[in-house]
């Protein structure tokens, strides 16, 4: 995510290392790319080359250990939402493996499947651990569910 709060163009300091798992030509002539997030990374440096390509150096971020069972027990509603999403026909087509006994897996997959703004997705990436992500997701889902549909 590009940091637009600064005068000069820069990147947020936390991102995701991804692997390309599929690509296809879209009707508008662009190339659609499907990626799988592998792990969080810290962006150490970034620069824009003469041809406009952004390059940089990164280092992986180790996830802190959490008590998955105790943490997930605090958020049964989030697991329920994720199970419902996981069973949706369009989601079942995706090559994702969700471990419902892992707080990291639940928080990252739920954050990737619900409609969030780029800033909210960055907020999840910036969270220290799965506990913070689950707290943020709980609040965001509550906000989404309390929004009145536009007529």
Language-model segment annotations:
Residues 1-151:
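N-terminal low-complexity, acidic/polar interaction/targeting segments
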